[in-house]
């Protein structure tokens, strides 16, 4: 007779819980940002590129961008396809190494990001209203702490994108 599986341990799985809330959050933010033709992942890519170029960088190497976003490069490339097709990002030459593929945000991408920010803010406010501001703040702190610990402290705790 086969030994039964104790599912009580599975119900406490941190990964499954995180994936469940991630799906719910993604649906909420995608619903808001979809009104301007973006997903939350695409919004994050545009925001990170915008931040880098405001900081003086003309472009960001794709590998570095994937690291900053906590994404695998193949996942990032999948998210980049529609952004490229819409002319929101463009391929660039890395100034320090011409062999490195890099990206820049276009003027059209900056305009779309500006248009998207109020929709993102609305989704953020709905989340804070549903959870309560204190719980939302504690959740963000816990998530920042988990990212830092799991990456060995490599990522800044205040770098949400």
Give residue ranges: language-model regions.
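C-terminal regulatory/oligomerization modules of transcriptional regulators
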Residues: 1-6, 56-57, 133-161
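Charged, amphipathic alpha-helical coiled-coil/dimerization segments
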Residues: 81-141
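N-terminal leader segment of winged-helix/HTH proteins
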Residues: 1-36, 86
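N-terminal helix-turn-helix DNA-binding core of bacterial DNA-binding proteins
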Residues: 23-75, 80, 155-161
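A structural signal for long alpha-helical coiled-coils and helix-turn connectors
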Residues: 50-53, 84, 90, 128, ...
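Alpha-helical linker/hinge and terminal dimerization helices associated
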Residues: 21, 25, 32, 69, ...
